[in-house]
Structure formats: C-alpha cells, structure tokens
C-alpha cells in the first residue's frame, strides 16, 4: 500500500517558507520533515546559515564523525508551468543548470534556490564550505554527474560524495539495483520497509495559487526523496 504524504505551510516570512511534510508509512508512526525553502529573490541568507549551524549541532549530539547530507539538485525545465526556457527544447534539459539545491540531514531539509541568470549574486559562503568540507559526506542518486555540473555552473566543489546505488551494489545483499532505481525503491531494499508513494505523472514547478512559490507537490515529494536518500546513506555508511 502506498504511503500518504501531506504538506503544511508552517511559517511564511518575507525571506523564506518553512514547510512540514508528514509521511505515514504503513504500520509505522508518522514521520515529520521540516523543510526550509529559500527563494532566489531574497538577499537575507541568515536562516540558511542558521540551518547549517543547527544540523551541525545535531551531528554533535548524535556523535557522528562525519556530517552526512543527501543532495538532490533539480531544474525547472522538466516541470509544468516553469516558464519558457531555451533548455525546454528536446534533448537540452540535461544541459540546463540546476536551479534548486535540495539537501537533507535527518528530518531537516533545505531547499536553496539559485539562478544562473544572476551571475553576480552572492551565495552564502557557509553553505559552500559545508558542502566542500572533507568531513561532509554528500550522498545521492546518480550524484557524480550532479557534482561535476554544480562545480562547472556554480563553483560548488564537493570533495567527498557517495552514489547510493553504487554503494548498495557493493553490499551484494540487496539484489539487482537498476541504474534508474528511485529513492523509494532503493529504500524498500536497504531500509526494509515499504516506502512506495503515488506521485503524479507530471508536477508543476510553481504553486499556481501563490506566485513565485514552489508547488506543494514539488516540496513534499522533494522532501521525501531527500529524506529517504539521507536514511539510505546512513544505513549504507555504517561502520
């Protein structure tokens, strides 16, 4: 049976939006994810810096040697209502720069939106340092290509990364792992629970009711994938 995934808008400020995504796996207690979204038009990065400080404190409490972060970069060219883009042309989507950086530590997600059309925009140095730190392990699906593209387009240098599909194959206990295996299907294999969810065939990038805000589906399913990737990474990287 597919999980139920719901979204609640918690705080709406001039700079950011805080969302709560509730996941209800079958026969399990609900899991609540907290997602901070930071849009491209907002100059105040203090909440992003606070988010990084917060997850590092959680890391210390967990006594984890390395900070494990899941990474799911995304681009609007493959979504409905995203606006015209040169990269919407057939065969060009993969060349488009990423426009949304989805990160997750435990139940805490950060959606940081950046825009390649604003080459002089200054991004929070704390975020770049966190991702490039050798003590940060960045995990994801098909992450090698994403790491290369982020460095090319935004000078984000991620030195310590792990592809979760490849790592699961190394264990040789999870059966065949397809090259396009989704976060939900990989979670079923690695975490041992049912994490299937019914996603819409197509999703909108923007919220049709609130101008320039991400759609609810974009936030809740992006948060789910980021959370599952984090949980898978923690499990596969156990000593």
Label the model's feature ranges.
Residues 1-71, 77-79, 117-118, 152:
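N-terminal accessory regions of nucleic-acid-interacting proteins
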Residues 39-49, 65-66, 83-215, 220-235:
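Conserved DEDDh/DEDDy metal-dependent 3′-5′ exonuclease domain
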